[in-house]
Amino acid sequence: MKRTALTLVAFIACNWAMAQNFISPNGAENAGSQPAINIAVISTKVSNADKQMELAEFNEQMGDLSGAISLYKKAAEEYNADKKYNKYGSVLLKISALLLEQENYNEAEQVVLKSALKNYSKIGSRNGQMLSYNMLGRIYFAANKLTQSMWFYTQQGILAQQLNNPSIYLDSVLGIADIKIKKKEFGLASKDLLRAEELAKASNLPQYNQRIRVSKSILTEKSKGKS
């Protein structure tokens, strides 16, 4: 029994000495042969808002827009409570876009007017205001409220020029052209589309080419119907 106890004590002492030798910052031998081990504590904490966003995006991808909207709303509330106002505004615009997709124009409008725009005005985000104007232009166009749509697309274009954002400016030109097509102002719409083509080429924005072609096709079809 005594021999066993002594053996155990010797084993523990030996291992303790080896451990001390390995981690000793003053050991010259170890300094040259062993890499320094720095244990970095990586935070894996995910906020409740981020979790809601992940679930919302999954629901959206699965086609469950109502479920996605509900989760996006929860995420928006969390971001607002955490004072992450840019994220809060972005989620609000996302909610509005999904409501627009559901043709729920009134609620889509209210989300932007009563929440997103107020948020961006409060934090002084002109870019956020510009994107809010774009969303309202789209909502009013879909709801056939063309005067309101024209006004917001125009405001979007003004801000885009001030912020030197050619992509968003081109988007506003196309939005206005689509309104003029719907109002059967075909000559004016044709001029806007020609201008849009020139802007896309000058600003190297080929991603708008397909949209321009679609608008031109609609213009041709509608103008033939008129004649």
Labelled PLM ranges:
Residues M1-S227:
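Intrinsically disordered, low-complexity regions
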